C-alpha cells in the first residue's frame, strides 16, 4: 500500500461514518489517548501485534483529527519533518534532546 492512498482511504472511511463532522476534536483527542494507552500496554507486554495495532490506530485517529481541523495529515507530517531534519542534539538516557534544550 502507498502511504498517500492509505490516508485517502482513512479520510474516506471517517467521512462515511460521520467521524469528521459528527464528532468533535475533544472526542478525537480522547480517542487518541485511549489508543496511546493500548500502545503502552502492548509495549509493556512486548506484544508486537498490540504495538502495531496501537501505532496504526493512533495514526488513524490523528488523520481524523487533522481532517476535522482542516489540515491534511500529510502536511502535518511534512511540517514536523522539516522542523527536525537538520536538528542537532544528543542522546541522554536513551532520549534525543535537541541542542536548544541542552
Where are these regions (language model features)?
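Flexible "arm" and connector segments at domain edges
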Residues: 1-55, 59-102
